[in-house]
Amino acid sequence: EFRRVLFRSNPPTPVSAIEPYLDKVDMVLVMSVNPGFGGQKFIPESLDKVKEIRSLLDAKGLDTDIEIDGGVNAGNLASVLEAGANVIVAGSAIFSGDVADNVKKFKEIMGAW
């Protein structure tokens, strides 16, 4: 039986609140919107949080995933990846409009990384 431990960080949660637990989790989920409903705009400060978490993980030699959820779209995906997130949740950006075309756009951007 395999289980993964995840820590979710909502927008107002400072990185300092989760830092002591980074070596105890398999993944950190950074919420880039306030949780509750889809279609919200991406909170740009989330990129700084991802960068800070990635820097701490690298400094500790940890191979921990960083997932980002909320407002991710083709326009900000490259910045999200550059910041250090490696697991992406994109609901509205995929399912609004032509799903196949949206998936193709995401794969093209992710392929560059």
Predicted feature residues:
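Short, small-residue-biased leader/transition segments that mark boundaries at the very start
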Residues: 1-6
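Active-site beta-loop-alpha junctions enriched in small/polar residues
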Residues: 8-12, 33, 69-75, 93
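Histidine/lysine/aspartate-rich catalytic loop segments that bind and position anionic ligands
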Residues: 8-46
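Catalytic cores of alpha/beta
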Residues: 13-25, 70-88
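Generic structural signal for well-ordered alpha-helices
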Residues: 18, 47-54, 77, 103-107
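Conserved, mostly hydrophobic/aromatic
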Residues: 28, 53, 69, 80, ...
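Glycine-rich phosphate-binding active-site loops on the catalytic face of alpha/beta enzymes
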Residues: 29-40, 83-103
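Short helix-capping segments at alpha-helix termini
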Residues: 57-63, 111-113
